[in-house]
Curated annotation (Swiss-Prot):
Entries under Pfam families matching the protein: TsaD (PF00814)
Lineage: Bacteria, Pseudomonadati, Pseudomonadota, Alphaproteobacteria, Hyphomicrobiales
Cofactors demanded by this protein: Fe(2+)
GO CC terms, sorted: cytoplasm
UniProt superkingdom: Bacteria
EC supergroup of this enzyme: transferase
Protein name (database record): tRNA N6-adenosine threonylcarbamoyltransferase
Length: 349
């Protein structure tokens, strides 16, 4: 079984082909990703119109490259999977229209995948883990703690009430004059910084509900930066290290709370899974590895190339859905907003 996956929800254009092995695990046969960082760097963030146009220019070539790399033709495919949202509507439409056209011409099943669900299922592609598991989904636009009970069965235990973790990293980087994208730049600067120089707040620590709030932390860093301006390179490094340490402390505390809540709604987890672009942060991975070990669980995080947006995760999510007969109609809509997990009932936990 081979599925083509198409990803165009933000600033990566991607096409991949994933197959199912005999043991049920996924095999990435091709994974083509073209980043638009250079196109957006001058603006300090993603410009939706530029992103959509860039997808149009390269998507067909990436699909052709994926097929060429595998030696497959369209007749060899069992399905066409595409990220139908959430994301920037212009980009989502580019991928969705392309996928619908291919599905019509080749008469292959269309699999309209939720981009967030694809992140949630990536650990099954790379490690073959079973359900249920606790997912920390942390990216530029989303921060959620989710009980993943099965394909299509997702219960949100906690979320951010303001900024997503990746968004906070990007805003701090911009405030400190670092390059775009901000997350890797903050992590790089933090390597030579003193994480104890600035006593930044740890919002929501100890709260029963495992939600996040990062706007206050971001404001506190801005006030410290203004207080000591003009900033030296060491000041920037120390601010980044202090900010990253605060984020890690908050995440560990919130995940610990989610682990407590998990048992009441989904039983014993098979693993703690970290997914999304922020899961590439080394300090966060180390802290989560320690936390998972204390809980007697493995930490499962995708290889770094699969933390960010990619076509392989879309293809795999499509393949998981295809095996369950969850095929979409050709009229499937583009969905710029598309929650993928139900909220935890107030009576649970």
């Amino acid at each position: 079984m081979n599925v083509l996956g198409i990803e165009t929800t933000c600033d990566e254009t991607a096409a991949a082909i994933v197959a199912a092995a005999e043991d049920g695990r996924g095999v990435i046969r091709a994974n083509e990703v073209l980043s638009q960082i250079a196109e957006h760097a001058a603006y300090g963030g993603v410009v939706p119109e530029i992103a959509a146009r860039a997808h149009v220019e390269v998507l067909d070539r990436l699909i052709a490259r994926a097929l060429h790399e595998t030696g497959l033709v369209f007749d060899d495919l069992d399905g066409i999977a595409v990220a139908a949202g959430p994301g920037l509507i212009g980009g989502v439409l580019v991928g969705l229209v392309t996928a619908k056209t291919l599905a019509l011409v080749t008469r292959k099943p269309l699999l309209a995948v939720n981009h967030l669900e694809a992140h949630a299922l990536t650990a099954r592609l790379t490690e073959g883990i079973g359900f249920p598991y606790l997912l920390l989904l942390a990216s530029g636009g989303h921060t959620q703690l989710v009980a993943v009970k099965g394909v299509g069965e997702y219960l949100r235990l906690g979320t951010t009430i303001d900024d997503a973790i990746g968004e906070a990293f990007d805003k701090v980087a911009k405030l400190l004059g670092l390059a775009y994208p901000g997350g890797p730049e903050v992590e790089r600067a933090a390597e030579t910084g003193n994480p104890e120089r600035f006593a930044l707040p740890r919002p929501m620590l100890g709260r029963r509900e495992p939600n996040f709030s990062l706007s206050g932390l971001k404001t506190a860093l801005r006030l410290e930066a203004e207080r000591i301006a003009p900033l030296t390179n060491q000041d920037v490094a120390d601010l980044c290290a202090s900010f990253q340490a605060a984020i890690v402390d908050v995440v560990v505390d919130r995940v610990r709370g989610a682990l407590r809540a998990f048992g009441d709604v989904a039983g014993h987890p098979t693993a703690l899974v970290a997914a999304g672009g922020v899961a590439a942060n080394g300090a966060l991975r180390r802290a989560l590895t320690q936390l998972a070990g204390e809980a007697g669980l493995p930490l499962v995080a995708p290889p770094l190339p699969l933390c960010g947006d990619n076509g392989a995760m879309i293809a795999w999510a499509g393949l998981e859905r295809l095996r369950l007969g969850l095929i979409d109609d050709i009229t499937a809509p583009a969905r710029p907003r598309w929650p993928f997990a139900e909220a935890l009932p107030a009576t649970a936990g």
